[in-house]
């Protein structure tokens, strides 16, 4: 989603290049233009999302819009679903070497989350040409149970 060569792609680089400390950084949401709160900025960093550049200005995404956009993208651009073994056969690559994000919050899945998909025979979803799954937080939120 990051557009603009020569511009910092993530919040860490943006802070470094602009000389603005993280605590003082102010970004607007690219979708709703609301200013991101400090926890939303931190979550944006943890999710390893790219800064979006419009007319030379950097934008992030608030938690509400990330969730909404994830649901919208899944409904509009879902292609098909496969078990882990099917994804690995299709891509000729282990899921552990692939960047697979949560389709709800967009966080990259870690090994434990990928293992959970494999061990519990949960499907991964091809959405907009990318493989997506559920992180432990969204998994528990959707299933109404604790993540462990």
From Swiss-Prot:
Zinc finger (unnamed): 29-65, 102-138
Keyword hit for Cell membrane: no
Keywords (A to Z) from UniProt: Activator, DNA-binding, Early protein, Host cytoplasm, Host nucleus, Host-virus interaction, Inhibition of host innate immune response by virus, Metal-binding, Modulation of host cell apoptosis by virus, Transcription, Transcription regulation, Viral immunoevasion, Zinc, Zinc-finger
Record keyword Transcription regulation present: yes
InterPro entries per record: E6, E6_sf
Major subcellular site: host cell
A GO biological process held by the record: symbiont-mediated suppression of host innate immune response
Subcellular location: Host cytoplasm; Host nucleus
GO molecular function, one term: zinc ion binding
UniProt GO cellular component terms: host cell cytoplasm; host cell nucleus
Pfam family, one: E6
Alphabetized Gene3D superfamilies for the sequence: E6 early regulatory protein (3.30.240.40)
Family according to the record: Belongs to the papillomaviridae E6 protein family.
Other remarks in the entry: Belongs to the low risk human alphapapillomavirus family. The cancer-causing human papillomavirus E6 protein has a unique carboxy terminal PDZ domain containing substrate but low risk E6s do not possess this domain.
Function in brief: Plays a major role in the induction and maintenance of cellular transformation. E6 associates with host UBE3A/E6-AP ubiquitin-protein ligase and modulates its activity. Sequesters tumor suppressor TP53 in the host cytoplasm and modulates its activity by interacting with host EP300 that results in the reduction of TP53 acetylation and activation. In turn, apoptosis induced by DNA damage is inhibited. E6 also protects host keratinocytes from apoptosis by mediating the degradation of host BAK1. May also inhibit host immune response.
Subunit structure: Forms homodimers. Interacts with ubiquitin-protein ligase UBE3A/E6-AP; this interaction stimulates UBE3A ubiquitin activity. Interacts with host TP53 and EP300; this interaction inhibits TP53 activity.
The name this protein goes by in its record: Protein E6
Taxonomic placement: Viruses, Monodnaviria, Shotokuvirae, Cossaviricota, Papovaviricetes
């Amino acid at each position: 989603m990051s557009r603009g060569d020569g511009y910092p792609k993530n919040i860490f680089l943006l802070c470094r290049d602009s000389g603005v400390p993280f605590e003082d950084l102010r970004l607007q949401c690219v979708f709703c233009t609301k200013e991101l709160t400090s926890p939303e900025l931190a979550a944006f960093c943890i999710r390893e999302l790219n800064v979006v550049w419009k007319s030379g200005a950097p934008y992030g995404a608030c938690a509400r819009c990330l969730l909404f956009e994830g649901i919208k993208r899944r409904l509009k651009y879902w292609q098909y679903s496969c078990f882990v073994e099917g994804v690995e056969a299709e891509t000729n690559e282990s899921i552990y070497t692939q960047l697979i994000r949560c389709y709800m919050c967009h966080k990259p899945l870690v090994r434990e989350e990928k293992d959970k998909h494999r061990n519990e025979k949960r499907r991964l979803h091809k959405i907009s040409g990318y493989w997506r799954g559920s992180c432990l937080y969204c998994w528990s939120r959707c299933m109404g149970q604790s993540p462990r």
